Amino acid sequence: MLSPVVHDAVLTPYGRQQCVEFAQANPDFQNIPELIIASPFRRTLSTTLLAVPKTFERLSPQGVILMPQLQETHDFPCDTGSDRDVLEQIEEFKDRGFDWSVLTDDWNKNEGFYAPTPEALADRAKWVRRFVRDRPETNILLIGHGGIFREIDGRMRGPNSGVTVSLSRWGNVECRVYTFQNDDDENATMIPIQEPSLIHAIDKPIDSHVEIEVVA
């Protein structure tokens, strides 16, 4: 399980295995995304390389964006990213074409825009939704974390208890497909799409080190 005291926690061996299994179970899916947007945490960078390796190879470097705004929603050490100079020297990520320039000095300070407050999280989630909606691509793959995905979804605090339960946790390497309600909504509201035939979930116990979501 994810220990809150481990800084920028990495994937467990089991989590890495599940990523590989996802890639093997979904060969056709690798051809769908036109853009990858990933949280710059170590575990999400590993997920990107292991779960969608062919997609990464096809799109990198221009089609792979690191997005600090996709980081997790708490200030625990495990949910705090590493400094740019640390990430650049990690063997797994070196020479893979990641553009680290987006990692400003404050990206992992959990303050201001990145503070773990309800107001800041709502603003950050809206920022992500609007960024994605304004992109020219149709099929965009977000690789991030359950906490920020719940904020991006926006229905967690709604009256529907079934939705709340569904959003309470993402399964390991689980994909959820969304579209936008319209093109000019100030909030960039997203609505879920069910496409079970497109994406096969890995039916295994949840390990919170692995999160993946699709936004279409």
Regions found by a protein language model. Give the residues of each.
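Beta-strand elements within well-structured catalytic alpha/beta cores of enzymes
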Residues: 37, 138-148, 152
